[in-house]
Amino acid sequence: MGFLTAVTQGLVRGADRMSKWTSKRGPRTFTKSRGAKKTGFYTNRKFVQIKEMVPEFVVPDLTGFKLKPYVNYRAPAGIDTPLTAKALFLETVAPAIEKDFKEGTFDANNLEKYGFEPTQEGKLFQLYPKNFPR
């Protein structure tokens, strides 16, 4: 009983629980690594590698590719403008409406052709009125 009491007191009173888990602290099966998965197993102090466990890197052919694989840390940050309803409309639906208007086939009563939904009935998430608890 004395051993268990000493161990629990050491843990409760602040034994170093945050220290690095090394082979001195861990079991015999512990192998120090950087998070990579093992590609085999040990048998009688010999490592047997399994071909199916070795990762394969699929790299596309980059011949003639002009960009370099390095970005300078002093490069200016990119500017991402937030996506608004107007911008989404102008990118997706507006070209089709303009095309139909120029051809003379635009019908204001048939907006379902462009993705317009007159009612939100039957939808799980309705856009209007807002369906969230207050």
Swiss-Prot record:
Originating gene: Mrpl41
Main location: mitochondrion
UniProt-annotated location(s): Mitochondrion
Function: Component of the mitochondrial ribosome large subunit. Also involved in apoptosis and cell cycle. Enhances p53/TP53 stability, thereby contributing to p53/TP53-induced apoptosis in response to growth-inhibitory condition. Enhances p53/TP53 translocation to the mitochondria. Has the ability to arrest the cell cycle at the G1 phase, possibly by stabilizing the CDKN1A and CDKN1B (p27Kip1) proteins.
Lineage, opening ranks: Eukaryota, Metazoa, Chordata, Craniata, Vertebrata
InterPro entries (alphabetical): Ribosomal_mL41 (IPR019189)
Matches recorded under Pfam families: MRP-L27
Similarity comment: family membership: Belongs to the mitochondrion-specific ribosomal protein mL41 family.
Coiled-coil blocks: none
PANTHER family assigned: LARGE RIBOSOMAL SUBUNIT PROTEIN ML41, MITOCHONDRIAL RIBOSOMAL PROTEIN L41
The keyword Cell cycle is annotated on this UniProt entry: yes
Protein's organism: Rattus norvegicus (Rat)
Protein name as catalogued: Large ribosomal subunit protein mL41
